[in-house]
Amino acid sequence: MRLIEVLEPGLFTTVQDVGREGYGPLGVSPSGAADAVSLRIGNRLLGNAEGEAGLEMTLLGGTFALPDGAVLALAGSDFGATLEGKPVEMWTAFEAAPGQVLRFGPTRSGARCYLCVRGGVEVQLFLDSASTHILSGLGGHKGRALKKGDVLTIGLANRNEQKRTGKNAYSTVGAGTVGKRRLSARALKELQPRKVLRVTPGPQSDWFSEAAKKIFQESTYRVAEESNRMGIRLQGGVIPAPAGGEMISEGVSLGAVQVPEGGQPIILFVEQQTTGGYPKIANVISADFHSLGQLRPRDEIRFERVEWDTARTLLAKQEKLMASEELMREL
């Protein structure tokens, strides 16, 4: 049994996989990696199944001892990681010898860095997922963010071809043996997080006046300090909310842009409530969800409307790249 010992947890570090889809009718939001594209790539670099659990660090990383050694990969934002004092490259599989210590600092770019390990982080599944759901205190490691002194178990690498294949699991694309791999320059460029988020019309978009839609599409918004995994709160152009910003509650989706009475939009995120009573002017497209996961407080964003067919085409293009041999190269 191989272990990860938490010497310092960082600001907010949790165990996350790709989430628990399909439980919205039971009131359980998907949770999972805020930037699932990065987590999936980190796992591919290691030969893991794409949906394997890793550690999601937010804004400030932790310090981890590897008493038994491990094969690792870092994905997402650069947190200035060092292994025994030597810099570690992002987006590249590397090996830590038994007893070595991996340290992270503050972010140098986006919001989240993913520490992936060959074999994955092994925890008790909750509703078919290893993801930590902070608001309910379930899943992950004891239902909470990591603390100093926590000890995590690394799974067996040779079990990757027998990963769960239920509704919450990505395929075992990439599972198997692995050499030293690096994300390709093309993939790094095409999957770069965006600050202009593409959106399709929301369920109540026709409730909003043309003037309100113009404000939404032409304003620059700043990510508020109060943002979290439940919702990304924005500050900027005030959108006149129809019906006083209230409506009969209905089911909501990841990436929905709600407009409450105050007129400041809220983007529903991975630990969103499953129903909501605010009108929704738009929905961030699936191909841009990973960009949401890299937004930091005070980052500035804009919105760009696209048609449904465009949104589907962009997602299909992204998934084609994720599944292709051009995603990474052998070193």
Predicted regions and their residues:
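Conserved "landmark" site that anchors the functional core of diverse proteins
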Residues: 1-331
